[in-house]
Amino acid sequence: MKLLFFDDFKLGVLKDDNVVGITHLVENIPHTHPQQLIAGLIENFEDYRDKIEHGVKGSDGYPITGVRVRPPLPKPANIDCMAVNYMEDGTRDEPAPINVFQKTPHAIIGPDDTMV
């Protein structure tokens, strides 16, 4: 099951090439913003799994091309990035030096969003 936020941070599940909204199925999770909603769902996922699976089966949802997919964590606390963290196609004798940098949490965008 692939969870995602879409449009105005509605919670959804990816079903084939469609997005099925599930916010109404988890609205009793105490939250004032999307970050709390997804954290509450993850924390109590086993309590909601059957309800979500049943709700997703009964809906076709919206084509993913017709919704705006949003960042998975609307307000992350910290983002640590690795510039190189793998052996490039087997052509290196040894791993590249570790190059770590941080990004501001306000720099998170969703797929196909414009970076400013």
Regions found by a protein language model. Give the residues of each.
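Glycine-rich, charged/polar anion/phosphate-binding loops
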Residues: 113-116
